[in-house]
From Swiss-Prot:
Cofactor, free-text remark: Binds 1 zinc or iron ion per subunit.
Binding residue positions for Fe(3+): 66, 68, 236, 311
Organism the protein comes from: Pseudomonas putida
Protein known as: Imidazolonepropionase
Residues noted as binding 4-imidazolone-5-propanoate in the record, renumbered to the chain: 75, 138, 171, 239, 316
PANTHER family: IMIDAZOLONEPROPIONASE, IMIDAZOLONEPROPIONASE-RELATED
Annotated N-formimidoyl-L-glutamate binding sites: 138, 313, 315
Amino acid sequence: MRTVWQHCHVATMAEGRYSAIEDAAIVTSAGLIEWIGPRAELAPVDADRTVDLGGAWITPGLIDCHTHAVFGGNRSGEFEQRLQGVSYAEIAAQGGGIASTVRATRAASEDELFASARQRVQALMRDGVTTLEIKSGYGLDLANERKMLRVARRLADELPLAVRATCLAAHALPPEYAGRADDYIAHICDEMLPALAAEGLVDAVDAFCEHLAFSPAQVERLFIKARELGLPVKLHAEQLSSLHGSSLAARYQALSADHLEFMTEEDAIAMAAAGTVAVLLPGAFYFLRETQLPPMDALRRHGVKIALASDLNPGTSPGLSLRLMLNMGCTCFRMTPEEALAGVTVHAATALGLGDSHGSLEVGKVADFVAWQIERPADLAYWLGGDLPKRVVRKGHEISN
């Protein structure tokens, strides 16, 4: 079906800029953008439908490129404990922290995980998200990692959005491998990844590179295996310390390196050369009350593409609003509103390997876009909450009005 969408203003986000078109029109057909430009330049179109957008601003559909949306349990009690002065180490000693989420996720059925994740994902969708990434990493064995990744695939099948599934089996050390990190990495490489990839459940491979998780050498073994399987890689890096994980990610042409509060200029240079996207996660920075800022000047100076994401997870960023992350990116990390919007559209698409098809409003790309009743694009980063999108369009069809 061919549809003409008109009486609107468009922030195309081409090349990471607003690239605004005033009094614009968009023609969509077969789920793609067939034409976009000033309405006055639109030639007569044999359209099945014409939609008046009432002067709304149009942006690409928002893309949340880093989430842990599938998990069992609830850790709000730990939040209360931390506010009362209980340390993370004490909480962990009591059986809390990520270990509690692993236990709850292992105990939950696939249907239970799907039902809870569906609610969280629908909250993101109401905020204008049309594409998101979902990581595993709370199962930490083959059966439970498979269960989480199956939920991610089901969400894509049953909801009108695109989902990229990332295997994060190297998220933490499971209790049955206590003190045997090398053995666990070998198990992931020899057993888990080949099986999950063969089942078509994995779009990318991720790991957590930190002193409290996995070393660069262990991560490199995982990356080598991912490359053998034809899977792109990503990395949680430099969140708590500098291990130059982001440089390691760049050596393997990673789609992205994420967090990056402690990255160095050397890391930024390596990422720029490799085309690896820097995914910043202000929700975790805010929730954990961190003080070390990502090196924004170095990222800009070397031309590293910068994305923003919610990092939705039960322990460090229980954030259900990607629009709130726009504001946090500006207030916490000193991004401009234009940089922040690029971070949840065109650069987020690149961080998922979707840069050729998603993330900006250009001819030939997927017709995912959002209509906002705002005065200017910067309003999306300026307002804390407020009205939901006026319309959300996925592959040229309205999914919310």
